[in-house]
Amino acid sequence: MKLAKHWIAAGALLLASGWSALAQTISSPKGGLQLHFALTNEGVPTYRLSFANGEEIIRQSRLGLEMTDGKKSFDKDLEVTATKESTFDETWTPVWGEVKQIRNHYNELLVELKKKSNGDPIAIRFRLFDDGLGFRYEFPGGKDRNFYVVKRELSEFAMTGDHKAHWIPGDYDTEEYDYQHSRLSEIRGLFDKAFTENCSQKAFSKTGVQTPLMLKTDKGVYINLHEAALIDFP
């Protein structure tokens, strides 16, 4: 089957506690950020991101995918089969944009896992830049591998506080809304006023918002959550 990739990027990130012994940590190229990966005792994959001084931006958060066939879900009961660290550094010239050249420099952690019950493999690839983190899920190919239908993604971004959010309502049809500015805890109460439903729009959650989502902490740290490279993804 084709390699299924799902990148989620967050600019300026972090997390904490409850880790099993199978923990991996990598630092960004200049050492300012640290990415921590671990399995819980139940075999649930988790990650957290912090500054080098230990200050958290994103707390310990779960990872995983729920499949339509629950027995094939990668949500728990996983074990690490291999890990690989690498570094990449290149500079490329965009065809159009605000800058002439862009440096693509990151340290990478590839975590290969398998389901204990049936041996099905999955990999999670992390790329840690000096200004943010990206990660994606990968399904190793091969004629003997099963096909999967993803029902729900379980990736979490556990914030450290009730940050200020700059958001618009989330739906699958349009982005034609006025931006709202509120605390995360206030989104539910403001959602109905911010959302205007018509024949081309339908909300999926009273707290669902569009990406990219820009957040600002009380300490002045900006966090941007976005997604890209949605290949063979529902």
Residue positions per predicted region:
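Bacterial N-terminal signal peptides
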Residues: 9-18
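Sec/Tat signal peptide C-region and signal peptidase I cleavage site
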Residues: 19-23
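N-terminal accessory beta-strand-rich subdomains and adjacent acidic, glycine-rich linkers
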Residues: 25-234
